[in-house]
Amino acid sequence: DILMRMSKMQLGSSSEDLNGMITRFESLKLYRDSLGEAVMRMGDLHSLQTRNGKWREQLSQKFEEIRWLIEEVRHRLKITENSFEQITFMQALQLLLEVEQEMRTFSFQLI
């Protein structure tokens, strides 16, 4: 699992930042999954809106968060010289882009 490998990487003083990135990414994956479940339960849009009247605002915030993570991973990919870390960050970037795309797909189905 890419998150497990990232959590084991030692990046000196930035290991705390890396752990924060992993936590945020896991949170985004859970959010993506909840959007997917709402889509699967068709007609759950009303329930989603009732449960969280500000769900569009929350969705916007999650997209900002994932864009920030994507940029952060791209930056780390550029500055990393270790090939193992480069591969790990490339895989993380691919996973982030997939999660972002799935969130977009689910959100368009809910709107």
Swiss-Prot record:
A motif (Nuclear export signal) lies at residues 2-11, 75-84. Binds M1 protein. May interact with human nucleoporin RAB/HRB and exportin XPO1/CRM1. Average number present in a viral particle is estimated to be 130-200 molecules. Gene3D superfamilies: 1.10.287.230. Pfam families: Flu_NS2. Belongs to the influenza viruses NEP family. This is Nuclear export protein. GO terms for cellular component: host cell nucleus; virion component. Mediates the nuclear export of encapsidated genomic RNAs (ribonucleoproteins, RNPs). Acts as an adapter between viral RNPs complexes and the nuclear export machinery of the cell. Possesses no intrinsic RNA-binding activity, but includes a C-terminal M1-binding domain. This domain is believed to allow recognition of RNPs to which the M1 protein is bound. It comes from the Viruses. It comes from Influenza A virus (strain A/Teal/China/2978.1/2002 H5N1 genotype W). It is found in: Virion; Host nucleus. Keywords: Host nucleus, Host-virus interaction, Transport, Virion. One of its GO terms (biological process) is exit of virus from host cell nucleus through nuclear pore. Its main location: virion. The gene is NS.
